Regions:
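Contiguous, well-ordered beta-strand patches that form the walls/edges
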Residues: 38-45, 52, 56-214
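N-terminal helix-cap/turn-to-beta initiation motif at the start of protein domains
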Residues: 20-34, 75
Length: 221
């Protein structure tokens, strides 16, 4: 299985967006907020076999829905921490992995049928040859990568140390260690909905346009 490196790239930016209002005395985000990040494209691209030179003809384009809810907790000074809803995400992630196994197995069945073997014949042949069922063998072979991907995602999303950054007007500025501005994000705030509308460099050129808008919704007390 291809390692899903692209997933963490999508999730990295959400650990910063919640800090937009820190240091702004006119606005308080105290409480809990949630943002749902869609990982479908990244997860599916990582496991897609349709472009494989040898086996691609036996696979359709992969599309497995997957998302993660990220919960931000703001203090009265707008410093924040963020964590994924790990119980929900673990269940959703495990379900997505099972669907990916189904996808991989179905392609192998198509290959076997092209070679003149039925599914049952291929299952029996595979188990006799490898000492395990096709599904169990694939799960065993991919377990280390899958566990690593899951841990990487959780680590990228989690910010356990309180974070605090600043704001100017409707812009959140990224800075280096010396306080030099590197780029900024724009936002709107309407009631309990915070929308990050875009990200730009200091020449006002859009960055990662496909990742926006990102929406945070305030959770009930």
């Amino acid at each position: 299985m291809k390692k899903l490196k692209a997933i963490s790239a999508v999730v990295v930016c959400i650990c910063l967006i919640a800090s937009i209002f820190a240091g702004c005395s006119k606005i308080s985000l105290e409480g809990k907020w949630v943002s749902t990040i869609d990982l479908t494209e990244e997860f599916s691209e990582g496991g897609d076999m349709s472009g494989d030179a040898e086996m691609g003809q036996y696979y359709d384009k992969l599309n497995i829905p997957l998302s993660v809810d990220v919960i931000y907790t703001f203090d009265s000074d707008n410093s924040y921490t963020c964590v994924p809803d790990e119980e929900k995400f673990k269940a959703d992630f495990d379900e997505a992995v099972e669907k990916m196994l189904d996808y991989m197995i179905e392609g192998m069945y198509k290959y076997a049928e092209a070679e003149g073997m039925s599914k049952n014949e291929f299952d029996a042949f595979y188990k006799e040859t490898n000492g395990a069922s096709l599904r169990d063998d694939i799960r065993s072979e991919t377990k280390a990568d899958i566990d690593s991907i899951y841990k990487e995602l959780i680590d990228e999303i989690t910010e356990s140390e309180p974070q605090k950054l600043g704001i100017e007007d409707d812009r959140f500025y990224h800075t280096d260690d010396n306080g030099n501005k590197l780029g900024y994000q724009t936002f709107t705030l309407e009631g309990d909905t915070l929308t990050i509308t875009g990200e730009y460099d200091m020449q006002d050129k859009p960055v990662d346009e496909d990742e926006y808008p990102i929406v945070l919704t305030k959770m009930a007390e």
